[in-house]
């Protein structure tokens, strides 16, 4: 996994809970504890810069991802441009695709082979594309209720295991994680609604670290849960309303905010040590959803203020 080279501006990281803490409902003072832990954590020298795409009118950029060559992939919800837009570092469009394929585009991820995957929060489709936009695999997860309220009733995110399997978070209306083989054959699913271990209230993002541990952003429970790949509960972190996760070697990045605040409120990008569960670094953010760590060691966040995606770049 890519290693993030950033400058730390302060000292020792502080966390609210270790990675092995037993599951529990976030306490009434969870926001106070979270803010104290974040305040004590070291800041990181990254500055947000809006991503502008000349000549393209985008809607909300729900999620962002990047390839090893630095290409950034934006997944946007407007009707005046293709849903998937690939841009270079200067925001110039390299290619785009996806018109007519989506109801509510939600997450976009680039797998280790450079293929581009997307989820749809309304239709339950999970689509795998070549880097040029050719459909390679189209899975209908199913199980969404009818009618679909506000177009949010299905898949949220996707993660890739070292053996080629992939895991889908099905969070809107459902509370489950599904595992598929590389060819799209469903192997198993696990999870249920609730606040206990292995239960979810909107599993919004999913990632797998180099050790094979599965991390699920249990958004409305205000925590990140950890599992093995069969769904066995390993522990949790109580770090607020986490929208996005991004694995980065020995660290996991969280795009998060206080649990009781409205969605897309100001919060933080937190760099958490996966072995200790402690915050190793922080970057303030004006709004949170999907995020990505680029091969360059810089961050992408979608959306930021005014629903515009942002680069988080090192000062020059």
Range-by-range predicted roles:
Residues 287-316:
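Blade-level signature of beta-propeller repeat domains, shared across WD40, Kelch, NHL, RCC1
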Residues 56-69, 100-115, 144-165, 195-213, ...:
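Beta-rich, blade/repeat-based domains predominating
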Residues 22-48:
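Blade/loop signatures of beta-propeller domains
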Residues 31, 49-82:
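Beta-strand-rich domains and repeat architectures in extracellular enzymes and scaffolds
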Residues 41-59, 91-104, 136-154, 185-202, ...:
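Gly/Pro-rich loop segments of beta-rich domains
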Residues 74-78, 116-121, 168-171, 214-219, ...:
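Conserved beta-strand positions in repeat-built beta-propeller and related beta-rich domains
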Residues 87-92, 130-134, 181-185, 228-232, ...:
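Short loop/turn segments that connect beta-strands within beta-propeller blades
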Residues 81-86, 124-128, 175-179, 223-225, ...:
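A short loop-to-beta-strand structural motif that recurs across blades of beta-propeller domains
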């Amino acid at each position: 996994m890519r290693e993030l080279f950033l400058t730390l501006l302060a000292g020792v990281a502080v966390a609210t809970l270790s990675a092995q803490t037993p599951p529990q409902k976030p306490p009434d003072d969870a926001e106070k504890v979270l803010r104290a832990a974040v305040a004590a954590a070291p800041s990181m020298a990254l500055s947000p810069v809006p991503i502008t795409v000349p000549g393209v009118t985008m809607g909300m950029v729900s999620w962002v991802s990047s390839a090893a060559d630095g290409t950034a992939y934006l997944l946007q919800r407007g009707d005046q441009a293709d849903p998937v837009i690939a841009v270079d570092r200067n925001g110039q469009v390299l290619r785009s695709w996806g018109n007519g394929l989506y109801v509510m585009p939600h997450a976009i991820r680039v797998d280790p082979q450079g293929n581009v995957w997307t989820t749809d929060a309304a239709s339950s489709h999970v689509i795998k594309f070549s880097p040029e936009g050719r459909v390679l695999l189209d899975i209908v997860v199913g199980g969404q209720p009818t009618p679909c309220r506000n177009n949010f009733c299905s898949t949220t995110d996707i993660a890739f295991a070292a053996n080629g399997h992939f895991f889908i978070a099905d969070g809107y209306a459902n509370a489950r994680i599904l595992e598929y083989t590389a060819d799209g054959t469903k192997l198993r699913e696990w999870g249920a609604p609730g606040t206990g271990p292995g239960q979810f209230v909107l599993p919004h993002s999913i990632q797998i670290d180099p050790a094979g541990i599965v991390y699920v952003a249990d958004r409305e429970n205000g925590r990140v849960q950890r599992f093995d790949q069969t769904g066995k509960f390993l522990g949790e972190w109580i770090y607020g309303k986490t929208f996005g996760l991004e694995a980065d070697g020995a660290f996991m990045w969280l795009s998060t905010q206080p649990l009781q605040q409205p969605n897309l409120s100001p919060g933080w990008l937190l760099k958490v040590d996966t072995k200790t569960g402690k915050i190793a670094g922080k970057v303030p953010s004006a709004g949170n959803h999907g995020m990505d760590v680029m091969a360059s060691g810089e961050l992408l966040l979608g959306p930021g203020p005014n629903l515009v995606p942002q680069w988080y770049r090192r000062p020059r």
